[in-house]
Amino acid sequence: MKFYLVGGAVRDNLLNLTVKDRDHMVVGATPQQMLEMGYRQVGKDFPVFLHPETGQEYALARTERKTGVGYGGFSCHASPDVTLEEDLLRRDLTINAIAQDEEGQLYDPYGGVDDINNRVLRHVSDAFVEDPLRVLRVARFAARFHRQGFTIADETLAMMTQISHSGELEALTAERVFLELDKALATDSPQVFIHVLNQCDALAILFPEIHALFGVPQPVKWHPEIDTGIHTLMVLEQAAKLCDDNSVRFAALVHDLGKALSPKEHLPKHHGHGQKGLALIKVLCARVRVPNDYRDLALLVSDLHQNIHQIEELRPDTLVKIFDKADLWRKPERLEQIALACEADAKGRLGQEEWSYPQADYFKQCFMAANKVAVKPIIEAGFKGAEIKAQLQLKRIEAVAEIKQNLNQTDSP
């Protein structure tokens, strides 16, 4: 019986990255032997055990055989006869198919160390094409390790394209697709995830609303990058630089879906694209089971981002209506989220990545002024029922007007 550290822990240690999860493989053991040593079995489909003290996972060495469609269409065989090499062979990428024994000795039968040194994401074997989930996983690894200089091997990208064309991506559950998207959004370079899916023809299948943006032109005056798909990638990249909030990053990703619906005769103009995109966002979110808080923020950003860009030109009453629509009185955290998504949109343009975005500060100042208006003096003044709400609205508009007046005085020579 031999114990090995495997997978991400070995990979991340070789990359000098923080090791978060430590997974182990056991060769030459039976489930009964593991139980006798105090391990607790948790795996149903194949034997996985939890260490009695550390709680870390220990899986018996196993092989897999394709028996059906999708990432769940596999039968597993675990026995003391399965070798280290056989277990590592079933893994997705060579960088994830390295093992380390208890003495620190590395076992690398498929060249994972060389691929780490050369910054290459490469499949372990031709069985790679049997699991459609690997398209999403490799795209996510490409996003996660983009800053370390990793790229996908051409032959691996070709296999990912083969999977896309096989029809097996449709077998992925909505929950699994969103889980991979959410993990990708949390990486340093989430735009790479979308780019890779587009490269291997998976984007059109999994996220057709986003795929439809590529090739759609925009006015060069406002968008030197021209292509709406490229703009979307740039906005997502900026959102990742601005904050760690995945709901903001998702809103950035889908803020311009409506541009795909602009009539060809009107291109490159996109009148009302923010509102046109609302239905598309709802469809995408329903299909992939996006959480409600992600969806609601995305809808607000799509609807309001053009107004926020021109916020200094808006009347005070219009601004208060925006605060109402966004329900900022009850959900003030949305103020920062909307501001960040709009800033990402403004900076996600060729040559404008370092531009300032004063609209965000003005947006926040106006809301904070309006939010300071107290209801108590209005009630004490004798107003009742609907009059209270009307007076509160008027006072909020006055507070915003004062901020606007101060801004105008500051801007005047």
From Swiss-Prot:
UniProt-listed Enzyme Commission number(s): 2.7.7.72, 3.1.3.-, 3.1.4.-
Reactions listed under catalytic activity: a tRNA precursor + 2 CTP + ATP = a tRNA with a 3' CCA end + 3 diphosphate; a tRNA with a 3' CCA end + 2 CTP + ATP = a tRNA with a 3' CCACCA end + 3 diphosphate
UniProt-annotated binding residues for CTP: G8, R11, R91, R137, R140
Keywords: ATP-binding, Hydrolase, Magnesium, Metal-binding, Multifunctional enzyme, Nickel, Nucleotide-binding, Nucleotidyltransferase, RNA repair, RNA-binding, Transferase, tRNA processing
SUPFAM superfamilies with a match to the protein in the record: Nucleotidyltransferase, Poly A polymerase C-terminal region-like
One Pfam assignment: HD
Highest taxon above the source species: Bacteria
Any one GO BP annotation for this protein: tRNA 3'-terminal CCA addition
Ligand binding (ATP): G8, R11, R91, R137, R140
Cofactor note text: Magnesium is required for nucleotidyltransferase activity. Nickel for phosphatase activity.
Coiled coil: none
Gene3D superfamilies listed in its UniProt record: Beta Polymerase, domain 2 (3.30.460.10), cca-adding enzyme, domain 2 (1.10.3090.10)
Co-factor requirement: Mg(2+); Ni(2+)
The keyword Magnesium appears for this protein: yes
Molecular function (Gene Ontology), one example: magnesium ion binding
Further comment: A single active site specifically recognizes both ATP and CTP and is responsible for their addition.
Quaternary structure (record): Monomer. Can also form homodimers and oligomers.
Record text about domains: Comprises two domains: an N-terminal domain containing the nucleotidyltransferase activity and a C-terminal HD domain associated with both phosphodiesterase and phosphatase activities.
Family of this protein: Belongs to the tRNA nucleotidyltransferase/poly(A) polymerase family. Bacterial CCA-adding enzyme type 1 subfamily.
Job description of the protein: Catalyzes the addition and repair of the essential 3'-terminal CCA sequence in tRNAs without using a nucleic acid template. Adds these three nucleotides in the order of C, C, and A to the tRNA nucleotide-73, using CTP and ATP as substrates and producing inorganic pyrophosphate. tRNA 3'-terminal CCA addition is required both for tRNA processing and repair. Also involved in tRNA surveillance by mediating tandem CCA addition to generate a CCACCA at the 3' terminus of unstable tRNAs. While stable tRNAs receive only 3'-terminal CCA, unstable tRNAs are marked with CCACCA and rapidly degraded.
Official protein name in the record: Multifunctional CCA protein
Organism: Shewanella sediminis (strain HAW-EB3)
Gene from which this protein is expressed: cca
